[in-house]
């Protein structure tokens, strides 16, 4: 069930990475940049956990596909970082739009929020990629080790 080749192991590693990373980073952003109280941010993060659980593994597979293309283009580390940013922004932005539509935001609010989120995502996408790689090593995901070799 949790063999190194297990899809479940891969899904658990990706889910762990997304829930932990998004909870910590977004809480810091909400409190220190957005001016939310600790309680407001905690509520926001608790609501976000189910969404993160649902999108973590699909995002991991999407990122892996983009990384394969990037690796074929160039082995340079800047290409990997650019691919991480591209994967993060192109996957997370539509998810964010859907969340904002669900909570009743208008198009003006959505445009402002998503634009800001894209800028932050451009800074955080590569960092999340490194954290995801670390979690996959921590969980001993074998396909990850084979892809890196």
Curated annotation (Swiss-Prot):
Which Pfam families does this one have? AlaE (PF06610)
Keyword 4Fe-4S present in the record's keywords: the answer is: no
Q: What is its main location?
A: membrane
Q: How does it sit in the membrane?
A: Multi-pass membrane protein
Source organism superkingdom:
Bacteria
Annotated compartments: Cell inner membrane
Q: Which residues form the signal peptide?
A: none
One Gene Ontology CC term in the entry: plasma membrane
Any one GO MF term held by the record is: L-amino acid efflux transmembrane transporter activity
Among its keywords, does the record have Lyase?
no
Sorted keywords for this record are: Amino-acid transport, Cell inner membrane, Cell membrane, Membrane, Transmembrane, Transmembrane helix, Transport
Q: Entry's HAMAP family? A: L_Ala_exporter (MF_00914)
Q: What is this protein called?
A: L-alanine exporter AlaE
* TM annotation in the entry: 16-36, 46-66, 85-105, 112-132
Q: What does this protein do?
A: Exports L-alanine.
Family according to the record? Belongs to the AlaE exporter family.
Any one Gene Ontology biological process term? Answer: amino acid export across plasma membrane
Q: Which organism is it from?
A: Citrobacter koseri (strain ATCC BAA-895 / CDC 4225-83 / SGSC4696)
């Amino acid at each position: 069930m949790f063999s190194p080749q297990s899809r479940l192991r891969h899904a658990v590693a990706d889910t762990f990475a997304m829930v932990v990373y998004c909870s910590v980073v977004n809480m810091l952003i909400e409190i220190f940049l957005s001016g939310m109280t600790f309680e407001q941010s905690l509520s926001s993060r608790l609501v976000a956990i189910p969404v993160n659980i649902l999108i973590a593994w699909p995002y991991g597979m999407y990122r892996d596909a983009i990384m394969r293309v990037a690796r074929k283009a160039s082995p340079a580390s800047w290409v990997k970082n650019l691919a991480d940013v591209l994967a993060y922004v192109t996957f997370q932005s539509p998810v964010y739009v859907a969340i904002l539509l669900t909570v009743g935001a208008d198009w003006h609010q959505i445009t402002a929020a998503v634009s800001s989120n894209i800028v932050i995502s451009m800074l955080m996408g590569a960092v999340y990629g490194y954290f995801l790689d670390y979690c996959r090593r921590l969980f001993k995901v074998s396909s990850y080790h084979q892809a890196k070799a």
